[in-house]
Amino acid sequence: PDTELFVDANGAYSARQAVAMAKEFAEQGVVWFEEPISSDYLLEMSRVRAAVGSRMDIAAGEYGYDARYFRHMLHAGAVDVLQMDATRCLGFTGFLQGAAIAASFGCPTSAHCAPSLHMHVGCAAEGFRNVEYFHDHVRIEQMLFDGFLPQKDGRLTPDLSAPGMGLTFKHKDAKQYAV
């Protein structure tokens, strides 16, 4: 298909509910089930993943804060895709460390929101699969930065003509939000 259907439960279900919902979602063609239960419960996550099998990918990790957390998650067999957020996991260095650990487990990675931030580091990460494109984050990026990455036909393309991430902070536009 041209489009894949993802569901983000944000840890809303119990393990039993998550398995039941996964069966329903699979019938609707869902291919990605993000945080079906709280990612704090790695043993339960691994049980959900085992029960779901190959019907869809189980993704989590956006609340991970360092390489140790990601290693524990992967060692527990809790995810099919390790999702990371550079704003939480020690920046680009932590993101790339997590990606290297995921690669050692044969696990692809994904980035949690902030596409203009994550696209560049994602391109440098082995096994990088996708960036979560969440409307509110994109709206904030547009509002506060020149050079944000617009999506076209479901794809993001890094701007290779600008240095670094290509973002310039809009100081005047941000001033109204200062506290």
Where are these regions (language model features)?
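Catalytic core of soluble alpha/beta enzymes
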Residues: P1-H112
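Flexible C-terminal active-site loop/helix
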Residues: S110-V179
